Amino acid sequence: MSAPRFRNGTFKRTLKRVPGGRKVEHYKKKKPSKHVCAKCGKVLDAVPRGRPYEIRKLSKNQRRPNRPYGGMYCTNCTKEIIKKEARSL
């Protein structure tokens, strides 16, 4: 039987065949949910989804868009925020 820490929905289960011919269950943590816009809640494009150790391996410009508020707001909300800032000057 699996260890108590694996008996929940946190882990993804996969069957692997080991060299001895047996099938064993391997456990892997699930991917985190997709990033969403902080203002409207729309799913963000160009922001990868993965565990922190996977994201750490990417270069800085692969982690998020290189523009103001990249990775926080969607393009439409970013446009609105920039317009509002420019008009308040």
Curated annotation (Swiss-Prot):
Single GO molecular function: structural constituent of ribosome
Record Gene3D superfamilies: 6.20.340.10
Assigned GO CC terms: ribonucleoprotein complex; ribosome
Basic residues bias locations: 13-29
Record keywords, A-Z: Ribonucleoprotein, Ribosomal protein
Top-level division of the source organism's lineage: Archaea
Chain spans, region Disordered: 1-29
Any one GO BP annotation for this protein: translation
Similarity comment: Belongs to the eukaryotic ribosomal protein eL34 family.
Name the record gives this protein: Large ribosomal subunit protein eL34
